[in-house]
Every structure is written in structure tokens, then in C-alpha cells.
Amino acid sequence: MRKQILILLGFSFSLIACQQNEEIGSVEDNANPNELTTRAASMRRVPTQAEKDNLKKDFPNLDVNNISVTGEATGTYNCIAYSMGITNKWIDPESFYNDFIEQYKNAKTLYGSSCNYEQTSTEGSNATVDGWGTSSIDMTHGSVVYSSGTWESKLGRYLRITHKRSELSVTLYGRILVSFIESRTKTDMSEIKELAKQIAQEDIELSDAEKQAVIDKAANINCEVKTKFNDLFNSWNEEISINPQTKYSSSTLAYTTLPQFKEMQAMGKNIIPLIMEKLLDEDNFFLLPLYDAIQTDSQLKISYKKGDAKILEGEQNKAKRTVRLWLSLSGN
């Protein structure tokens, strides 16, 4: 019930942004309501000196003395989700330019955003979302307009901050390659309610019996293997949060470049029950690429066709669906 409420709240916030485009941020922003698409009334604070130092090192064009922190560090959602008005799921960006555009053009259908998006000029002033990339085959980031002249970005697992439109350029995000505005097609509230109902039905909660079955399978793994895996996992998770190449990344695939991932992958299929056990905690959804890299049976992997409503679920629900599939079909 709690998750359904969160989803509906998310829809309500993004519906306001897409349909009414009203100012819902701080009155201190003196924002133009016609330009503001802030997804929710957000907290604002001044970054600490340590945060300023880190951000300045990794984003040299960022004026850290003129930014605000609008959201604390969390791995629950990323920049792509936030730019679509979603804060309860992580949505990996499509790497290829055209596929990335399709994500936004079909944001309502694919992810449950309250509206789809249309392309607009990257040079104009009417854009509400910018898509970033280092090239047409490496799309990396999404930022959203916050107020007149100010933009907002969720930086991977890290903070959500305000910034001038192009201040994150010449970094791992590359530069702005495409811009969007909310689709002018009116959103029917009845459609939103129906979509919310559909997503609630798709939401997975593993039963106690399923969880125990996973725990039992993991308990059968050799202690030395388990210790090695846990040590590598903890080291990997820590590295993700401090390495600039992963700390700010909106794609869980970026985490696969770290040496700990390679070491865990080399441990082979024996660690799959341990991966499943970790996935019982939905915050560990970023383990999915490791499972996909190790699992050789395609029937035990979750994949989607374009337009599949299950894409709505995000990485967290996909992780739970993967656990359930593995339990139902695995002979291990």
C-alpha cells in the first residue's frame, strides 16, 4: 500500500509539472512559472565545504558557490528518472542517441511518467529537459529545468543539485546533445489512474517462503567462497560511491568497469545464490549486471521488448522479478 501511495504521489507531482507547469519550488527562487518544471517542492540547503571541494574537482566548470543541494545522496533514483518526475525507481539511460530519445518520447508509456516529451532545439530557451552524452553512442545524463536560468541534476547515487545549464559539461557526462519539452498532448487523468493501477499490480513483493528459499540456497555455498564474495561486494559498493566514474553515473553498467566486478564475475555461477540473497534487499539492484554476466541461461534472465509495460517497474522491481524467476526455473 505504501508503494502504491508513493507512486500516485509521484504521478501527482509530475502531472502538475507537465499539465499546469506551475511554480512548486521555493518562493525564494523568484521563478517564472512558465519555465519551471520542478517535480516536487524540494528541500534546499547550502553544500558543505567538503561537498563543494568534491564537486569542483569533478565538475571544473561548476560554480559551487552558487549552487544548492535539493536532495541528499540516494541510490533509489537517478537523473533519468528524476527528469521524468519519478523519484521511486532507477531508470538506466539507453546508450544510443536514438534509443535515448525514444525513452523520453515514450516516458509515459514506458516508465509511468505523467507525460511524454518532444524534441526541441538545444539552443532555445523553452527546453525543460536536456539529454547529455559523450557521443551518439554514449548517452549519459538527464537534467531538468529548476527555475528561470537554473537547472537541476541528480548526480548518479550522489546529491541532487542546482546548476547553470551547461556547467556540468566537459566531464563524464559530455555535453548537451538533445533537449525536450513536455508533449503538448493533454494527459487524461483517468489514464493516469489506470496506469497507476497497472503499476501497482506489477509491483512485486517476495513472500517469506521465497526469501527463505533464497537464504537456504545461499547457506549451502562454501564459507570461503561466501567470504570472498562478500568482501568483494563491499569493496565494490564502496568504490562505486567514491570513484567519480561511477559515483555520478546514471547507468549501473558503469559499475561493471571496476576491478571488483571483474573479480566477482570470475568466480562464476557458484556465486549466483549469493547474488540472489543480496537482491532480497532492493537497494542492491545494481547487482543485476553481474547476474546477467554470469548467468548463461537466457530463460533465467529478465528482458523486455520495446513497449512492454513491465519496463515501468524500474531496476528495483526487476531485481525482485529476477529472484522469483530464478527460484521458479533454476535447478540449483
Locate predicted features.
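Cysteine-nucleophile protease catalytic domains, especially the papain-like/related folds used
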Residues: N54-K108
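C-terminal motif of bacterial Sec signal peptides marking the signal peptidase cleavage site
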Residues: S14-A17
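...with weaker cross-activation on analogous glycine-rich loops/strands in unrelated enzymes
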Residues: Y97-L159
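Active-site or metal-binding loop neighborhoods of secreted/extracellular toxin and effector enzymes
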Residues: S136-D138, G142-S190, R321-S328
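Extended repeat-based scaffolds of very large eukaryotic assembly and lipid-transport proteins
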Residues: D188-N332
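Bacterial signal peptide processing site
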Residues: Q19-E22
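Sec-dependent signal peptide recognition
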Residues: R2-L8
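Post-signal peptide N-terminal segment of mature Sec-exported envelope proteins
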Residues: V27-R44
